[in-house]
Amino acid sequence: IFGHELPLTVTQMLWVNLIMDTFAAGALASLPPNKEVMKDKPRKNEAFIVTPPMRNQILWIGLAFVAFLMGLLYYFTNAEGEINRHDLACFFTIFVMLQFWNLFNAKAFATGKSAFNGLLHDTGFITVALLIIIGQFFIVTFGGDVFRTVPLSWQDWLLIIGSTSLVLWIGEIFRLFGKKKK
């Protein structure tokens, strides 16, 4: 849509797939059982695993991410229809950080509690979160031609981490004002 070069490379998508399908699944699986789940009525055998609230959250967050990322590609594209390597590294990191913060929203989904609730005791979750951040830093800093990245400045990192964390803070606001009613 915005030129000839894809905004994410195959190796970058492999990293995203690894952190979201493997690491994130491990992080969420490492969480202690939620005692509130046992208070819910059993679901029918033919009921979908993805509930309507879950579907809606996936849909709206997905649409918001796509709109934001498409706008970002437009913003980064120069007059010749190209995006420089620095901006591509920023785009890649923004993409990963959006997923990273949304992992915290997934942790808190349908609990009616903050994503920070019990976080200090969720060592598996914290370990995976740190692994994702550290892995992303090393890939962007040292990935070079393999990952089509250039090192980002600490200002870039602060801006990306701060701005993408809005995903978490917006989720926290929704959880605060939309407490689960029993």
Question: Positions of the model-derived regions?
Answer:
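Transmembrane helix-loop junctions at the membrane interface of multipass transporters and ion channels
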Residues: 1-5, 74, 78-79, 137-153
